[in-house]
């Protein structure tokens, strides 16, 4: 986390990574996420895309090595071995993440839930690849959780 001085006040500014996984409407989703993050005093460090579980794992490892917060957009509507829920479940089975570290994010506008996964000082937020759903899932509760987790 770095501090940036802006005019007469000090602002905390934190960067996070964004990974698109089997996502559509990526440009619209990126704009929607940026808008939500700006309100938190956050920005996007890097944007990458993945179309396979292995590539997603590699990108996630890279992202978590440089950022404490990573957003994954897409893949929630897929089932089987390529579905994001299945991929994250397998990846996290070898970590210290417990069921209490995973929160389901309700989607008022669609069928797919989002997920918030916290392990130590790092967090992964998985959201659907529909901008209107993504924006609505950025509820006051999620914003508050992110702010509290990172001291924003």
List each language-model region with its residue ranges.
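Structural motif
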Residues: 21-24, 50-61, 74-75, 127-128
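Glycine-rich phosphate/diphosphate-binding loop of Rossmann-like nucleotide-binding domains
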Residues: 11-52
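Intrinsic structural disorder
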Residues: 2, 27-31, 39, 58, ...
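Short, Lys/Arg-enriched N-terminal segments with co-localized hydrophobic residues
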Residues: 3-13
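Proline/glycine-rich low-complexity loops and linkers
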Residues: 61, 65-70, 78-151
């Amino acid at each position: 986390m770095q501090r940036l001085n802006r005019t007469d006040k000090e602002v905390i500014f934190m960067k996070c990574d964004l990974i698109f996984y089997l996502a559509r409407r990526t440009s619209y989703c990126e704009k929607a996420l940026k808008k939500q993050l700006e309100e938190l005093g956050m920005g996007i460090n890097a944007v990458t895309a993945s179309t396979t579980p292995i590539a997603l794992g590699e990108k996630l490892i890279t992202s978590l090595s440089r950022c404490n917060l990573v957003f994954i957009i897409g893949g929630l509507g897929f089932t089987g071995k390529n579905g994001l829920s299945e991929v994250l479940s397998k990846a996290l089975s070898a970590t210290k993440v417990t069921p209490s570290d995973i929160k389901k994010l309700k989607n008022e506008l669609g069928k797919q839930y989002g997920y918030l996964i916290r392990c130590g000082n790092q967090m992964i937020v998985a959201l659907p690849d529909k901008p209107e759903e993504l924006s609505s899932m950025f509820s006051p509760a999620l914003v508050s959780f992110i702010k509290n987790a990172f001291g924003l």
